[in-house]
Amino acid sequence: MKPLELDVFLCRTDNFGVLVHDPETGFTAAIDAPEEAPILEAATRRGWKITHIFTTHHHTDHVTANLALKEQFGCEIIGPINEAVAIPGLDRAMADGDSFLFGDHTVNVIETPGHTAGHICYHFVDDKLLFAADTLFALGCGRLFERPAADMWHSLQKLAVLPDETAVYFGHEYTLSNARFALTVDPDNERLKSRAAEIEALRADGKFTIPTTLGLEKETNPFLRAADPAIRRNLVMEGKTNEEVFAEIRKRKDHF
């Protein structure tokens, strides 16, 4: 089985567009459809025909180009069953634990409510790829629009059990702000400090910070580290639950 090929580019202001291409079948999936023109440019540049859209959630900046791409390519749109009525052009609705094949590549669906009520992530099992959209960012997580903090904490735990080497592709280039915030709640984390310096340099050069890895996030992302004693001491929350610590971190980030 040939490895998948990926193309990553910016859409809108800070959305990531991602195309996933299977060279054996010619299938090409857009991970969400934030904006038509950059997606078409990337597909044309690579000589790929878009056959699928894997929608993660219903927010406008992730589904804007669904219908235009479907009209042009006749692509199949897959998306979350619990947001089915809000996904333009949806063909197949997926629930937590569902799986399907993209060529010979197995894709598992992980429902991660928090940012939205029915948000899903796509895990390419053998390829060790996770498309986490607005659930898990590099050094961050999505804002809580439709579900409480406890739900998002448990959603993140569902991702955290995947292999550490899993490459994580996320929905927005928020990493620099996330790094600066992370240092306020985990200031003595040496790995975080070195990573923040790397991110500052990357962004100064106009380079992307995508992908990250799950292992790196577990070492440095405060939203995955609510159980960490140092973070709890810094927040003066030693006796609180993981959900309460996570909620406090999310609240602080909202006002950062």
UniProtKB/Swiss-Prot annotation:
One of its GO terms (molecular function) is hydroxyacylglutathione hydrolase activity. Pfam families: HAGH_C, Lactamase_B. It catalyses: an S-(2-hydroxyacyl)glutathione + H2O = a 2-hydroxy carboxylate + glutathione + H(+). Pathway: Secondary metabolite metabolism; methylglyoxal degradation; (R)-lactate from methylglyoxal: step 2/2. Zn(2+) 1 binds at H57, H59, H115, D134. GO terms for biological process: methylglyoxal catabolic process to D-lactate via S-lactoyl-glutathione. Monomer. This is Hydroxyacylglutathione hydrolase. It comes from Rhizobium johnstonii (strain DSM 114642 / LMG 32736 / 3841) (Rhizobium leguminosarum bv. viciae).
